[in-house]
């Protein structure tokens, strides 16, 4: 009798030399008929395929999100550039819904918030961006501009300085110079001339040999009262472009403001030859010429010319006094303790002594005459405002003489 054994799965007797139970094999499906290692290998391959498909699907989904975010951002960016801040705000918020942590989108959203007057919300976004990236130049610049809106000078200066020393895309030197010049304009608008001058000196030290830039910074230095530093920049610009009207006019104004009227007249006249439409330069040149024609204290003048000028200046001052009194409705001959009637009475009494032959022989009389001229011009200026033409020239001579005295 052939040896048999009992199947451990179904309990039926099977031949001893049979590897499989004939009863079990009849009931098994495809998967149960596979060997264990074959089955596991198939499962592993299936898992890999599922992983690849899932990764592809997720990647495609994120790609679609990025595309939607970029589309919304581009639309919002264009709207903001066109001045449609409210539309831009909505579009950029949509972009952030698909790319929540994008720092560029957050920065542009802050700019849109500022444009719509929602400054505090913008500040929160900007401060969060700054906390994540303290060296971001654009973020620091936007914070500086917020401080400028609120006229918070120390805070604005701090953020401007942070922006200057931050990281910038493109040409960092150009970006930092632009930030510094923006700071300078804010300081000038805030009447912080000394601070503006200090910033401009730093800018001037790092300027490339570019006549336009040198002239631009020179013009700002003049506004800050740095005439000597401005003049150096204008002369550097003229080395490259000797006939460039803006640099010639700038140099002429520097000489004018420092009392060098002969050089001022020369440079301003050259500027006007290049560009006759420089009205401010023309007025300044004419005033410089008037100073040179009226000043009796110029060293190389002879005694007769000094006397002639002093007499002419006295007549001009009296005319200014009478015109100012008429403008203000003041009766110069009335008994009045006001400055204009008092000066008029003094000048009327003094007038018979203002003779050219007397002035040419008596330098002390000439000085006394000019002192009275200066007093009249200053009093008229206080009563009727800054003069023009010959009277402005006399006032400039007066200020120059006061500065020359110990």
Regions found by a protein language model. Give the residues of each.
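Register position in tetratricopeptide repeats
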Residues: 81-82, 115, 149-150, 185, ...
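Eukaryotic alpha-helical solenoid repeat scaffolds
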Residues: 257, 262-406
């Amino acid at each position: 009798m052939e040896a048999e054994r009992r199947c451990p799965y179904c309990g039926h007797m099977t031949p001893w030399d049979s590897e499989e139970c004939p009863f079990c094999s009849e009931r098994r499906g495809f998967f149960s008929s596979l060997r264990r290692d074959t089955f596991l290998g198939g499962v592993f391959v299936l898992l890999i395929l599922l992983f690849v498909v899932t990764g592809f699907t997720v990647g495609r989904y994120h790609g679609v999100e990025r595309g939607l975010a970029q589309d919304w951002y581009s639309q919002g960016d264009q709207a903001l550039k066109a001045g449609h801040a409210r539309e831009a705000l909505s579009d950029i918020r949509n972009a952030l819904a698909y790319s929540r942590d994008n720092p560029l989108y957050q920065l542009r959203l802050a700019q849109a918030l500022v444009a719509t007057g929602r400054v505090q919300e913008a500040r929160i976004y900007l401060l969060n961006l700054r906390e994540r990236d303290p060296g971001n130049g654009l973020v620091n610049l936007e914070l500086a501009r917020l401080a400028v809106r609120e006229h918070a000078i120390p805070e604005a200066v701090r953020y401007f300085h942070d922006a200057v020393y931050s990281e910038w895309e493109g040409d960092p030197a150009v970006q930092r110079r632009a930030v510094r010049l923006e700071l300078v304009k804010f300081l000038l608008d805030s009447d912080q001339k000394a601070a503006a001058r200090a910033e401009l000196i730093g800018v001037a030290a790092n300027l490339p040999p570019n006549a336009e830039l040198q002239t631009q910074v020179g013009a700002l230095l003049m506004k800050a009262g740095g005439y000597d530093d401005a003049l150096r920049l204008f002369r550097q610009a003229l080395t490259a472009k000797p006939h460039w009207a803006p640099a010639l006019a700038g140099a002429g104004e520097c000489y004018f403001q420092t009392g060098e009227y002969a050089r001022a007249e020369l440079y301003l006249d050259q500027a006007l030859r290049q560009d006759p439409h420089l009205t401010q330069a023309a007025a300044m040149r004419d005033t410089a010429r008037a100073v040179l024609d009226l000043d009796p204290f110029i060293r190389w003048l002879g005694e007769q010319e000094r006397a002639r000028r002093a007499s002419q200046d006295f007549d001009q001052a009296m005319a200014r006094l009478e015109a100012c009194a008429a403008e203000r409705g003041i009766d110069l001959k009335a008994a009045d303790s006001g400055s204009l009637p008092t000066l008029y009475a003094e000048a009327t009494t003094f007038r018979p002594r203002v003779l050219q032959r007397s002035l040419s022989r008596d330098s002390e009389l000439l000085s006394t005459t000019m002192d009275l001229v200066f007093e009249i011009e200053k009093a008229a200026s206080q009563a009727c405002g800054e003069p023009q033409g010959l009277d402005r020239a006399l006032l400039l001579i007066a200020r120059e003489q006061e500065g020359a005295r110990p």
